[in-house]
């Protein structure tokens, strides 16, 4: 073992097309003949190869896809300040609502496909993909009515009439994108569970260029407004979806996991919906949390300034968050694959390494934000008042970025293990019982404004992060391996619920 370890590290990361699990990591971690620090060094070398093979393209994909939303808001801001506020409100109140819900439901595929792939049950991946897509599309049908009635909903919530009217126009053009999400997220998780992430990165990069060109033409050449920008956003997402479908059909890498359309996709839809709902609750409670901050800001004094400054801060936070979400995807894939393959120590080690790297990057990002706090808003608007407000909120933004370097990664570990139901309860308590009420009291009762709202919400995030750290440190990884095997057996036999508290 000692003489071969270094040589093994220079072999290809993935030696066999049968599995994306490297059994050398588990072997190194269990080799007691190696000195402790030598064992950790060799394990780090193996895991870092895996981590950046998965995380780097995933981060790129998430940043690029989120970049389309940010570009849409930037162009809206150059149309007018009310248009920026309306686009931000429409995006936060409706688009991100559906984005979080459907992405959360899609994470059911992440758990099942990841563990099935690690266990070499390749034929089930395509079935899980199709079932999830059917369930998500059916979910989109009633959700589209929320978009159609966005104007009266926003007015009933107390948003200013002019902003609510403009926001509803923006939201109408976003209706096609929710169906794109319903197809994209299962595909995304299907590919990620097989460590296929680079093709999606190329597709997203090409789409971003198309999105930028079309948005520029719409605003500066044709003089169109919010509706055109939101329709272009929807069109861009459908480009991504179609390109990924073509890749799955044509690529030899998906030959064993995609065997064509199957009637099995329509079997057990209710059970799969329940599984997806448990996954959705966990992620939605996280995704909607920051959006509630923007909605509450619309009720403050001078709501236009509050919305503009918070929208810019949330856009910056979203860019940083996408980096953490890339590590979230890597953690989920690594943990689910290793658990499915029966490698408990490798799963635990991957959790530690991924969380540590993500945290260090988030600290660097927070320092950059604080250094550029007086100029960073000018990428979105020319208003000096908004720039001053953004600079004033930058310390809160920096703290949020650091916390987001830890929490999403641990959520990815939870998805890989199938802990979605448990984390959902944690999120309810920390976010909605503690964070939002405290933020509301500080923001409105004590008249601290956006700072008060954000302070309470940071407290909720901190509490949730601490709980997830404690739970992860106390995890019995051998038992998690047993649960992963049992979960796959239960799903194939359709005997018991997949996710237990």
From Swiss-Prot:
It is a multi-pass membrane protein. Keywords: Membrane, Transmembrane, Transmembrane helix, Transport. It comes from the Eukaryota. The chain crosses the membrane at residues 44-64, 84-104, 134-154, 163-183, 200-220, 222-242, 280-300, 310-330, 352-372, 396-416, 422-442, 453-473. One of its GO terms (biological process) is xenobiotic detoxification by transmembrane export across the plasma membrane. InterPro entries: MATE_euk, MATE_fam. NCBIfam families: matE (TIGR00797). This is Protein DETOXIFICATION 37. It comes from Arabidopsis thaliana (Mouse-ear cress). The gene is DTX37.
């Amino acid at each position: 073992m000692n003489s071969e370890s270094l040589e093994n590290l220079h072999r290809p990361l993935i030696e066999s097309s049968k599995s994306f699990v490297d059994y050398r990591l588990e072997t190194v971690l269990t080799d007691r003949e190696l000195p402790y620090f030598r064992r950790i060094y060799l394990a780090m070398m193996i895991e870092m190869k895996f981590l950046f093979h998965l995380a780097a393209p995933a981060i790129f994909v998430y940043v690029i896809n989120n970049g389309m939303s940010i570009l849409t808001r930037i162009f809206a801001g150059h149309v007018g300040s009310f248009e920026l506020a309306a686009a931000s409100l429409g995006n936060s109140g409706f688009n991100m609502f559906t984005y979080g819900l459907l992405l959360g439901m899609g994470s059911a595929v992440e758990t099942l496909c990841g563990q099935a792939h690690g266990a070499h049950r390749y034929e089930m991946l395509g079935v899980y993909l199709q079932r999830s897509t059917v369930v998500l599309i059916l979910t989109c049908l009633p959700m589209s009515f929320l978009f159609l009635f966005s104007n009266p909903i926003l007015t009933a919530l107390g948003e200013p009439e002019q902003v609510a009217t403009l926001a509803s126009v923006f939201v109408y053009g976003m209706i096609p994108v929710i169906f794109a999400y319903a197809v994209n997220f299962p595909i995304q998780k299907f590919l990620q569970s097989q460590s296929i992430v680079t093709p999606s990165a190329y597709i997203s990069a090409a789409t971003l260029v198309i999105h930028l060109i079309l948005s520029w033409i719409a605003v500066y050449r044709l003089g169109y407004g919010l509706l055109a920008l939101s329709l272009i956003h929807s069109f861009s997402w459908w480009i991504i979806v179609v390109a990924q479908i073509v890749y799955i059909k044509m690529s030899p890498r998906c030959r064993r996991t995609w065997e064509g359309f199957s009637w099995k996709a329509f079997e057990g839809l209710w059970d799969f919906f329940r599984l997806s709902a448990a996954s959705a609750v966990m992620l939605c409670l996280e995704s909607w949390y920051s959006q509630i901050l923007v909605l509450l800001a619309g009720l403050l004094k001078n709501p236009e300034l509050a919305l503009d400054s918070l929208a810019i801060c949330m856009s910056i936070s979203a860019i940083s968050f996408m980096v953490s979400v890339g590590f979230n995807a890597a953690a989920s894939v690594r943990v689910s694959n290793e658990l499915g393959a029966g490698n408990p120590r490798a799963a635990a080690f991957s959790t530690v390494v991924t969380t540590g790297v993500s945290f260090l990057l988030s600290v660097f990002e927070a320092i950059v934000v604080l250094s550029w706090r007086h100029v960073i808003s000018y990428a979105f608007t020319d208003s000096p008042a908004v720039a001053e407000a953004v600079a004033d909120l930058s310390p809160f933004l920096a703290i949020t970025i650091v916390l987001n370097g830890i929490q999403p990664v641990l959520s990815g570990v939870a998805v890989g293990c199938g802990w979605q139901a448990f984390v959902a309860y944690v999120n309810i308590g920390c976010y909605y019982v503690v964070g939002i009420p405290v933020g509301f009291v500080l923001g409105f009762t004590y008249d601290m404004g956006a700072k008060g709202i954000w302070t309470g919400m940071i407290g909720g995030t901190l509490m949730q992060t601490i709980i997830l750290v404690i739970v992860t440190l106390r995890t019995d990884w051998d038992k998690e391996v047993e649960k992963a095997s049992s979960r796959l057996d239960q799903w194939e036999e359709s005997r018991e619920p997949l996710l237990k508290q």
